[in-house]
Swiss-Prot record:
Disulfide bonds: none
Keywords from the UniProt entry: Transferase
Reaction(s) this enzyme catalyzes, per UniProt: 2 L-leucyl-tRNA(Leu) = cyclo(L-leucyl-L-leucyl) + 2 tRNA(Leu) + 2 H(+)
Origin: domain of life: Bacteria
Site description Could be involved in aa-tRNA binding, residues in chain: 85, 95, 179
Family per record: Belongs to the CDPS family.
Organism from which the protein derives: Photorhabdus laumondii subsp. laumondii (strain DSM 15139 / CIP 105565 / TT01)
Name of the protein in question: Cyclo(L-leucyl-L-leucyl) synthase
GO molecular function annotations of the record: aminoacyltransferase activity
Length: 234
């Protein structure tokens, strides 16, 4: 059910350039993480409602089973069980999203739900993903940042289920990497992938790897018309 009182968020750009792009209000891509308790139905409804007022065009980014299940496998769940569990979780999000974006107040916005698998044959996406993988193999600083991001994702999952005991095997950290590699192209250049002029990827916290992607610390960089915004619900 849509909320009658307009939900309110603040959005803070990763850089001053991000803030300038956000102020244009052109396009927002809302990132949703399966298995993250932050993304309750109410929170997602509120964020979509707010974004649809703030930005002219809004789309949703949701992982597909193959990549998202990697996080569960890296958390110690059997591969078959992980895929089944991920399938159920993503179906739940898709049902909720289908309901929200089909309501009268949002239908005219033509909000799309984007999944990684939609881009399996997309040349631009595959090119960006290859650049990410090459940077991982060629740059020690980028490799370290990717591994740390993977570690933090697994740690968050284990903490959420009461299973974190202070150490995570490096092999498990590597298992979750494809999820990160699949997501980074949307951090780098959503305008190129979705055919919009400017775009802001919205999420509720900074990416640990983000600062380096914006300031030129790595072999790959964020495109000029791409921004990243940290949203906080008031």
């Amino acid at each position: 059910m849509l909320h009658e009182n307009s939900p309110s968020f603040t959005v803070q750009g990763e850089t001053s350039r991000c803030d300038q792009i956000i102020q244009k209000g052109d396009h927002a891509l809302i990132g949703i993480s399966p298995f993250n308790s932050r993304f309750s139905k109410d929170y997602v409804v509120d964020l979509i409602q707010w974004s649809s007022h703030y930005f002219r065009q809004v789309d949703i980014l949701l992982p597909c089973e193959r990549e998202a299940s990697r996080l569960l496998v890296a958390s110690g769940i059997d591969n078959v069980k992980a895929i089944k569990k991920t399938h159920r979780e993503i179906r739940r999000h898709l049902r909720n999203l289908d309901y929200v974006i089909s309501t009268a107040t949002l239908k005219s916005k033509q909000i799309r739900v984007i999944q990684f698998s939609d881009f399996s044959l997309n040349h631009d996406y595959q090119s960006l993903k290859t650049q990410v993988e090459n940077a991982f193999n060629e740059s020690e600083s980028f490799k370290k940042s990717c591994l740390d991001m993977s570690f933090q994702a697994i740690k968050g999952r284990l903490k959420g289920t009461g299973q974190y005991f202070g150490q995570i095997d490096l092999q498990l950290v590597y298992k979750a990497l494809p999820y990160i590699f699949a997501e980074i192209p949307f951090y780098l250049n959503t305008p190129r992938l979705l055919g919009v002029k400017y775009s802001t990827l919205l999420y509720h916290r900074p990416w640990s790897i983000g600062k380096g992607l914006f300031n030129g610390s790595y072999p790959i960089q964020v495109a000029d018309k791409q921004s990243y915004g940290i949203v906080t619900q008031l």
